[in-house]
């Protein structure tokens, strides 16, 4: 019987991917990003190791949600003080901090432990089409989140 071998973290090469979020659906995009961060798209995937790649998301301000979610979806945050709960709709948060929408969606799809926090540091989200990671030579990754669409 052959033994199962674990991937050596020193020999794993981490790729950098650029994903354009313009016109993409938020949840479907976030699940694809989480899968890449986790490394589930690779044959070397191991549940307890960080075998995933780095992901750069550009045009985060152009991500879309369907239905009435732009007015009805709310984001909560709390200052930690009594009465410190702040509630904000998708539209208002998108106008104020569009990167946070994609970050929160992806973070919710990662493990809730130290590995998940480590994986989250490999996600870079930018609201414009420019990013400061050209030196890493990122590869463009096309994700189609609209079923039947040509996007």
Curated annotation (Swiss-Prot):
**Does Cytoplasm appear among the keywords?**
no
- List the residue ranges of the region (Disordered): 129-151
Q: Which InterPro entries match?
A: Ribosomal_uL13, Ribosomal_uL13_bac-type, Ribosomal_uL13_CS, Ribosomal_uL13_sf
Give a GO molecular function annotation for the protein: structural constituent of ribosome
Q: Which CDD domains match?
A: Ribosomal_L13
User: Among its keywords, does the record have Transmembrane helix?
Assistant: no
One Gene Ontology BP term is: translation
One of its Pfam families is Ribosomal_L13
Any one GO cellular component localisation term in the record: cytosolic large ribosomal subunit
Tell me the keywords, alphabetical order. Answer: Ribonucleoprotein, Ribosomal protein
The record's section on PROSITE patterns has: RIBOSOMAL_L13
Q: How does it assemble?
A: Part of the 50S ribosomal subunit.
Please state which protein family the record places this protein in.
Answer: Belongs to the universal ribosomal protein uL13 family.
Per the entry, what this protein does is:
This protein is one of the early assembly proteins of the 50S ribosomal subunit, although it is not seen to bind rRNA by itself. It is important during the early stages of 50S assembly.
HAMAP family assigned: Ribosomal_uL13 (MF_01366)
Matching entries from PANTHER family are given as:
LARGE RIBOSOMAL SUBUNIT PROTEIN UL13M, RIBOSOMAL PROTEIN L13
Q: What is this protein called?
A: Large ribosomal subunit protein uL13
Provide the organism lineage as a comma list. Bacteria, Bacillati, Cyanobacteriota, Cyanophyceae, Oscillatoriophycideae
- From the UniProt record, report the name of the gene that encodes this protein: rplM
């Amino acid at each position: 019987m052959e033994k199962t071998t674990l991937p050596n973290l020193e020999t794993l090469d981490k790729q950098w991917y650029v994903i354009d979020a313009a016109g993409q659906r938020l949840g479907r995009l976030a699940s694809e990003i989480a899968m890449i961060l986790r490394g589930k798209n690779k044959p070397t995937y191991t549940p307890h190791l960080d075998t995933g790649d780095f992901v750069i998301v550009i045009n985060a301000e152009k991500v879309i949600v369907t239905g009435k979610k732009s007015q009805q979806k709310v984001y909560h945050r709390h200052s930690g003080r009594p009465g410190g709960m702040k509630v904000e709709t998708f539209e208002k948060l998108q106008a104020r901090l569009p990167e946070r929408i994609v970050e929160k969606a992806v973070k919710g799809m990662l493990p809730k432990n130290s590995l998940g926090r480590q994986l989250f540091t490999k996600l870079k989200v930018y609201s414009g089409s420019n990013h400061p990671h050209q030196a890493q030579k990122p590869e463009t990754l096309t994700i189609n989140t609209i079923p039947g669409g040509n996007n």
